[in-house]
UniProtKB/Swiss-Prot annotation:
Subcellular location(s) per record: Cytoplasm
Record note on quaternary structure: Monomer.
Record field: catalytic activity: L-lysyl-[lipoyl-carrier protein] + (R)-lipoate + ATP = N(6)-[(R)-lipoyl]-L-lysyl-[lipoyl-carrier protein] + AMP + diphosphate + H(+)
Sites where the protein binds ATP: R71, G76, A77, V78, F79, K134
Binding site for (R)-lipoate: K134
Domain BPL/LPL catalytic: 29-216
Keyword RNA-binding in record: no
Keyword Coiled coil: no
Cited Pfam families: Lip_prot_lig_C (PF10437), LplA-B_cat (PF21948)
Protein name: Lipoate-protein ligase A
Gene label: lplA
Domain of life: Bacteria
Disulfide bonds: none
One GO biological process term: protein modification process
């Protein structure tokens, strides 16, 4: 029986693909070598220990229907679209070795006519007239008896959109998370005009088979045709949840301030695991009572725009004569934390 397994996802859903990756990684026999090929529609993927409010322009993502997905490996934030090919190599220990998977990807690129080389710990670069340009970034995860190496190859990604989502708003955040380094990147289509996801997948597959000296049939998976993966529904539910994607952010503080016609407002939030642990409100408003009441209501609240709005608008019952001010405050606050 072959020790290789090849899976190709037909889904562009990042939460589905990361849930498949997680399930296979947890359940594969330690003797198996797995290659999983996939791609995501418009998504910002962040590292396991990152703060989405610090790394991403979450408001712009929401406006443009770009998803957020937290992966289980470390490293920085990346933007995925259908111009990216994603790969995951998995193996049991002691055989797991990221230099093997890196060489498989380099061999695949070489077979396609691209000479690339490893750079630093995580990147593959090509030489251009403007200097070295990154075409691939990777991240890794290891447990006691197994490991995986996953990464992306830039084929024809809309690089102009990176700055839209990976540069956060000028929010006054003092965060304990990890800040991503923005690398200089290029697409493989600059070197291989017309290169497709299917061609790249085939090249990686052939290099994978060549390295191990055996072949297997590909398993095509999609939300309508999932492999037999115990606990997949629970893993997908977690992967797609707000609690995992946002709530796992490291503790951070957020300062918001705005001047309205009726006075200036400064809000200080301390946030842990996606919940406000401390809220302070400062104002020169002639009627500070609603804002003082708001500070109390926000303690323990989920740090989510709709929840903040809900708590603010709940004060209309107690302060009906401040309706205009509270509605202005509610709309501003929701926009500021998106």
């Amino acid at each position: 029986m072959s020790t290789l397994r090849l899976l190709i996802s037909d889904s562009y859903d990042p939460w589905f693909n990361l849930a498949v990756e997680e399930c296979i990684f947890r359940q594969m026999p330690a003797t198996q070598r797995v290659l999983f090929l996939w791609r995501n529609a418009d998504t910002v993927v962040i590292g396991r220990a990152q703060n989405p409010w610090k790394e991403c322009n979450t408001r712009r993502m929401e406006e443009d229907n770009v998803r957020l997905a937290r992966r289980s490996s470390g490293g920085g934030a990346v933007f995925h679209d259908l111009g990216n090919t994603c790969f995951t190599f998995m193996a049991g220990k002691p055989e797991y070795d990221k230099t093997i998977s890196t060489s498989i990807v380099l061999n695949a690129l070489n077979a396609l006519g691209v000479s690339a080389e490893a750079s630093g710990r995580n990147d593959l670069v090509v030489k251009t007239a403007e200097g070295d340009r990154k075409v691939s970034g990777s991240a890794y995860r290891e447990t006691k008896d197994r490991g995986f190496h996953h990464g992306t190859l830039l084929l024809n990604s809309d690089l102009s959109r990176l700055a839209n989502y990976l540069n956060p708003d000028k929010k006054k955040l003092a965060a304990k998370g990890i800040t991503s380094v923005r690398s200089r990147v290029t697409n493989l289509t600059e070197l291989l005009p017309g290169i497709t996801h299917e061609q790249v997948c085939e090249a990686i597959t052939e290099a994978f088979f060549a390295h191990y000296g055996e072949r297997v049939e590909a398993e095509i998976i999609s939300p309508n045709k999932t492999p037999d993966l115990p606990n997949f529904a629970e893993t997908f539910a977690r992967q797609s949840s707000w609690e995992w994607n946002f709530g796992q952010a490291p503790a951070f503080s957020h300062l918001l301030d705005e001047r309205f016609t009726w006075g200036g407002v400064e809000l200080h939030f301390d946030v842990e695991k996606g919940h406000i642990t401390r809220a302070q409100v400062f104002t020169d408003s002639l009627n500070p009572a609603p804002l003082e009441a708001l500070a109390g209501r926000l303690q323990g609240c989920l740090y989510r725009a709709d929840m903040l709005q809900q708590e603010c608008e709940a004060l209309l019952v107690d302060f009906p004569e401040q309706e205009k001010e509270l509605r202005e405050l509610s709309a501003w606050m929701a926009g500021a934390v998106r």
